[in-house]
Amino acid sequence: MNALLTPDYGLIFWTIVNFLLLVFLLGKFAWKPIIGALEARENKISQDKKDAQEARDEAQKIKAELDVRLSNISKEAQEKLAQVEALAKQQKDAMIKDAQASSERMIATAKEEIEAQKNQALKEVKKEIADMAVEAAAKIAGVKTDPKTDAALVDNIVKDIINKA
């Protein structure tokens, strides 16, 4: 027990020499590679942080561009929708105008046809009246007339009737 508590100066000397030799050798051969590896790792971490920040900045820039594009697309869509609505309204108005014009033409055509049929009916009635008047006059007179005379007489009677109407 005494031997453990008593220092051996030779052992202390060689322990110190070994320690200093170990420190020297580690400093000469191992310390630089360890420090180099630590610095390389620190540089890599620093570079990764820079790259991550650049990527984050780029992502924010792209997001901002996409937001602008989305806004522009939304505006364009609204403009297109407004144009389509305006075009649809124009087409609707044009169709209504065409339908009105068509109905007015149909009404005018129908009125013209009615007027033509009325005039034709009046002519036929007047001709029949004139024929009946000629026949009645011929019966009263008891005279047989030729067709030329009948036609001239009918024309005169028709003219008289037309002038009176």
From Swiss-Prot:
Record key words, sorted: ATP synthesis, Cell membrane, CF(0), Hydrogen ion transport, Ion transport, Membrane, Transmembrane, Transmembrane helix, Transport
Top-level taxonomic group: Bacteria
Main location group: membrane
Cellular-component GO terms for this entry: plasma membrane; proton-transporting ATP synthase complex
Entry keyword annotation includes Transmembrane helix: yes
Coiled-coil region list: none
Transmembrane segments: 11-31
InterPro entries xref list: ATP_synth_B-like_membr_sf, ATP_synth_b/b'su_bac/chlpt, ATP_synth_F0_bsu_bac, ATP_synthase_B_chain
SUPFAM superfamilies: F1F0 ATP synthase subunit B, membrane domain
Claim: tRNA processing is one of the keywords in the record: no
GO molecular function ontology, one term from the record: proton-transporting ATPase activity, rotational mechanism
Localization in the cell: Cell membrane
Membrane association type: Single-pass membrane protein
Subunit structure: F-type ATPases have 2 components, F(1) - the catalytic core - and F(0) - the membrane proton channel. F(1) has five subunits: alpha(3), beta(3), gamma(1), delta(1), epsilon(1). F(0) has three main subunits: a(1), b(2) and c(10-14). The alpha and beta chains form an alternating ring which encloses part of the gamma chain. F(1) is attached to F(0) by a central stalk formed by the gamma and epsilon chains, while a peripheral stalk is formed by the delta and b chains.
Similarity-based family: Belongs to the ATPase B chain family.
Function: F(1)F(0) ATP synthase produces ATP from ADP in the presence of a proton or sodium gradient. F-type ATPases consist of two structural domains, F(1) containing the extramembraneous catalytic core and F(0) containing the membrane proton channel, linked together by a central stalk and a peripheral stalk. During catalysis, ATP synthesis in the catalytic domain of F(1) is coupled via a rotary mechanism of the central stalk subunits to proton translocation. Component of the F(0) channel, it forms part of the peripheral stalk, linking F(1) to F(0).
HAMAP family reported in the protein's UniProt record: ATP_synth_b_bprime (MF_01398)
Protein name as annotated: ATP synthase subunit b
Organism of derivation: Elusimicrobium minutum (strain Pei191)
Lineage, opening ranks: Bacteria, Pseudomonadati, Elusimicrobiota, Elusimicrobia, Elusimicrobiales
Gene: atpF
